[in-house]
Amino acid sequence: MSDLKINGRGRSGQVPMNLLDRAVTWFHPQAGLERMRKRAALAAASGYVGARSDRTSLQRWAASVGASADTDTLPDLEILRARSRDLERNDPMAHSAISTKTANVIGSGHVVRPEVDFSRLRISADEAEAWEGQALDIWNNWAESRDCDVTRAQTFVELEDLVYRSRLLSGDVFVIRRYKERPGRLLGTCVQVVEADRLSNPNWVSDSDRMAGGIEFDQDGAPAAYHFADRHAVDRGNIGGVVWRRVPAFDDTGRRMVLHIHGPRKRPDMTRYAPMLAPVIEALKQRSRYSEAELMAAVVSACFAIGMASPDGDLSEGLIQQNKEGATADSQIVLTDPGQIFDLLPGEEVKSFAPGRPNPQFAPFIDAIAREVGAGTDLPHEMLVKQFQASYSASRAALEMAWQFFKTDRALHVSQFCEPVYEDVITEAIARGLLKAPGFFTDPLRKQAWLGSTWMGPSRPTIDPVKDANADEKYLAMGVTTRTRIAAERFGVDYRAVRRRIERESAVADNPQSSSVSEDVSPRPGAADQERGKGRNRRGVKLWPVS
């Protein structure tokens, strides 16, 4: 009996006989026929073509059925991270995807604008603005110092870049809240960034319901603790072995001790996250190999490629493998240097050949791959390859589409990293008495009101600033936007700071003789004691008195 053909619901197909079907048919043809009819009926009853197994195009599709998010993700993370990092280091298109997203989501860093809810706190708008200025001074003093990093290597802006870039490359990254008092510093709050590889199950035990990917869970599935290795497993000089440290997810007050920075959660119960390049790793690697082959062919075409025909036998018999120093004297196929003159042995003749490069199909093929990579990384093709050769409307639409993705990513980054760190800094400042915030530690609603903030990132990409300015002016006249929002979105600045600066510049322009030293200038060297006597610390940041 051959495969049984079916025709049902307007579709036709073929049910292939497996080994068991053939065995049943061999011993009992009638039972085998009935078995095939039942299988055909089941295949015809399938509601979705994509779920059918009788089609040749779907027979070898080995998709996991009934597997959890961790089962589908955790076993592949190690190799996905390694390949993503290798591509980012060596592949121009992968590097462009990571750098373009980082430049537009992080850029030169986010600027915070404290915004307390003065109506809930029952204070005046002027009092709220004064408090916000104090909080901003303390934040800037902390964020602009490299002491905010436990390794004392990066400022907060640089930490932002590191955290976001690591998230894209590794899928997730972790920030541990630390406390270290250092001489000359107002606050002891600092953070430690830990790479994704170092979070793993102690002694590499298998995943279970209570621990997976280095994260320990409670009975509700919420993180209870994180297990960090003290080093990477393959570090050189790792004589003493790897030691794991258990860090509680929350402290006694319910504050998160570890910030898990990752992309959008795509499935329930998802523990760890795949790198951004995961969907396009194969396409990027194949494109890289093809590009290398075409480049080598172009180099060969540009040189004088020769083949030496010897009367002693077949050419291939004289070929030997090249060593690290290049072709040896016994090689029979060589690329000559420009203008080189060479001698032939008796009986040898030279046959030249050309590989026919450049290939006219190279650019269209690379462009098609770039579009595929852009779709897989949520980047328009134009931004990925840094070329805007389409029409004005198409280029503008590409920027608008990219801006939607950047806004989403930026909001996630701010909520996962910037806001929690800002809240830590302000909380310590209040606890030390540097800021006065009644009810902060006793009323959760008042605490939330004191910690309100807005974050401004890189400006929105544009290709026609004049049209955008005209549109903003009309939106402002309609009352559907604000100057604060326009300043933040178009220029990445705080409108209130811009307004104050304009007022000062206008005053100087109206009365040039009254020009004075800018408020932004730091105290001159040697005047630290005088400045502290005036209510400023040694870095020139005002220490607001607390009554």
Question: What residue ranges belong to the model's regions?
Answer:
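A broad, structural surface signal
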Residues: 133-144, 161-169, 173-176, 180, ...
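Structured, mid-chain assembly/scaffold modules that mediate subunit interfaces
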Residues: 94, 98-260
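Extended, helix-rich architectural segments
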Residues: 1-167, 183
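Activation/maturation switch segments at domain boundaries
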Residues: 2-4, 18-27, 33, 350-352, ...
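Charge-rich, acidic-biased intrinsically disordered regions
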Residues: 154-160, 176-194, 314-329, 421-457, ...
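Surface-exposed loop-to-helix/strand elements on domain peripheries
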Residues: 129, 340-463, 502
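Extended, charged amphipathic alpha-helical segments
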Residues: 254-395
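Short coil/turn segments at secondary-structure boundaries
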Residues: 154, 178-179, 297-303, 384-388, ...
